Amino acid sequence: MSKLVPPETKDLSPAQMEQVFSKVSQFFSLLSEPSRLKILFILCDGEQSVNTVMERAGSSQANVSRHLTALHRAGILARRKEGVTVYYAIEDEASLEICQSVCARVVEKIKS
Protein backbone atom coordinates (compact mmCIF):
# COMPACT_ATOMS: atom_id res chain seq x y z
CA MET A 1 0.00 0.00 0.00
CA SER A 2 1.24 3.44 -0.92
CA LYS A 3 2.18 5.89 1.83
CA LEU A 4 0.39 8.61 -0.16
CA VAL A 5 -3.13 7.38 0.52
CA PRO A 6 -4.66 6.00 3.73
CA PRO A 7 -5.44 2.30 4.24
CA GLU A 8 -9.16 3.03 3.75
CA THR A 9 -8.49 3.24 0.02
CA LYS A 10 -7.35 -0.39 -0.32
CA ASP A 11 -10.79 -1.56 -1.46
CA LEU A 12 -11.29 1.18 -4.04
CA SER A 13 -11.27 0.46 -7.74
CA PRO A 14 -8.85 2.27 -10.07
CA ALA A 15 -11.75 4.47 -11.22
CA GLN A 16 -12.57 5.37 -7.61
CA MET A 17 -8.90 6.15 -6.95
CA GLU A 18 -8.99 8.52 -9.92
CA GLN A 19 -11.90 10.28 -8.21
CA VAL A 20 -9.89 10.50 -4.99
CA PHE A 21 -6.92 12.03 -6.80
CA SER A 22 -9.18 14.47 -8.64
CA LYS A 23 -10.85 15.64 -5.40
CA VAL A 24 -7.49 16.02 -3.64
CA SER A 25 -6.23 18.06 -6.59
CA GLN A 26 -9.32 20.29 -6.40
CA PHE A 27 -8.73 20.78 -2.67
CA PHE A 28 -5.13 21.89 -3.15
CA SER A 29 -6.13 24.07 -6.10
CA LEU A 30 -8.66 25.84 -3.88
CA LEU A 31 -5.96 26.50 -1.28
CA SER A 32 -3.35 27.58 -3.83
CA GLU A 33 -4.72 31.14 -3.82
CA PRO A 34 -2.75 33.35 -1.36
CA SER A 35 -5.83 35.46 -0.55
CA ARG A 36 -7.67 32.36 0.63
CA LEU A 37 -4.77 31.39 2.87
CA LYS A 38 -4.77 34.91 4.31
CA ILE A 39 -8.50 34.59 5.02
CA LEU A 40 -7.94 31.26 6.80
CA PHE A 41 -5.16 32.92 8.84
CA ILE A 42 -7.59 35.69 9.84
CA LEU A 43 -10.30 33.19 10.77
CA CYS A 44 -7.88 31.30 13.04
CA ASP A 45 -8.77 34.02 15.57
CA GLY A 46 -12.38 32.79 15.52
CA GLU A 47 -15.58 33.77 13.79
CA GLN A 48 -15.37 37.07 11.91
CA SER A 49 -17.79 39.24 9.95
CA VAL A 50 -17.20 39.79 6.24
CA ASN A 51 -16.35 43.43 7.01
CA THR A 52 -13.72 42.43 9.57
CA VAL A 53 -12.16 39.92 7.18
CA MET A 54 -12.19 42.57 4.45
CA GLU A 55 -10.43 45.15 6.68
CA ARG A 56 -7.84 42.71 8.00
CA ALA A 57 -7.14 41.26 4.55
CA GLY A 58 -6.84 44.73 3.01
CA SER A 59 -8.98 43.67 0.09
CA SER A 60 -12.24 44.71 -1.55
CA GLN A 61 -15.58 43.31 -0.43
CA ALA A 62 -16.11 41.69 -3.83
CA ASN A 63 -12.75 39.91 -3.67
CA VAL A 64 -13.15 38.77 -0.07
CA SER A 65 -16.73 37.62 -0.65
CA ARG A 66 -15.67 35.59 -3.68
CA HIS A 67 -12.99 33.77 -1.68
CA LEU A 68 -15.23 33.27 1.37
CA THR A 69 -17.92 31.79 -0.86
CA ALA A 70 -15.45 29.39 -2.49
CA LEU A 71 -14.15 28.23 0.90
CA HIS A 72 -17.70 27.85 2.22
CA ARG A 73 -18.85 25.84 -0.79
CA ALA A 74 -15.87 23.53 -0.30
CA GLY A 75 -16.99 22.89 3.29
CA ILE A 76 -13.93 24.54 4.83
CA LEU A 77 -15.86 27.47 6.31
CA ALA A 78 -19.17 27.75 8.14
CA ARG A 79 -21.40 30.75 7.48
CA ARG A 80 -24.15 32.32 9.53
CA LYS A 81 -26.20 35.45 9.08
CA GLU A 82 -27.29 37.78 11.86
CA GLY A 83 -29.51 40.53 10.49
CA VAL A 84 -27.61 41.93 7.53
CA THR A 85 -24.21 40.84 8.82
CA VAL A 86 -22.66 37.60 7.57
CA TYR A 87 -20.13 35.77 9.74
CA TYR A 88 -17.65 33.07 8.76
CA ALA A 89 -15.71 30.58 10.86
CA ILE A 90 -13.49 27.61 10.17
CA GLU A 91 -15.62 24.47 9.99
CA ASP A 92 -13.15 21.88 8.70
CA GLU A 93 -10.34 21.68 11.23
CA ALA A 94 -8.52 19.06 9.13
CA SER A 95 -8.14 21.56 6.28
CA LEU A 96 -6.77 24.10 8.73
CA GLU A 97 -4.27 21.55 10.10
CA ILE A 98 -3.01 20.85 6.57
CA CYS A 99 -2.47 24.58 5.98
CA GLN A 100 -0.74 24.99 9.34
CA SER A 101 1.57 22.07 8.63
CA VAL A 102 2.55 23.39 5.22
CA CYS A 103 3.03 26.94 6.57
CA ALA A 104 5.25 25.63 9.37
CA ARG A 105 7.38 23.79 6.82
CA VAL A 106 7.70 26.92 4.66
CA VAL A 107 8.69 29.01 7.69
CA GLU A 108 11.37 26.40 8.51
CA LYS A 109 12.75 26.69 4.98
CA ILE A 110 12.71 30.51 5.09
CA LYS A 111 14.56 30.59 8.43
CA SER A 112 17.26 28.11 7.38
Residue map of PLM features:
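Short, structured helix-loop boundary elements
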Residues: 14, 18-21, 61, 96-99
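N-terminal helix-turn-helix DNA-binding core of bacterial DNA-binding proteins
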Residues: 22-63, 86-94
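Beta-hairpin "wing" of winged helix-turn-helix
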Residues: 72-82, 89
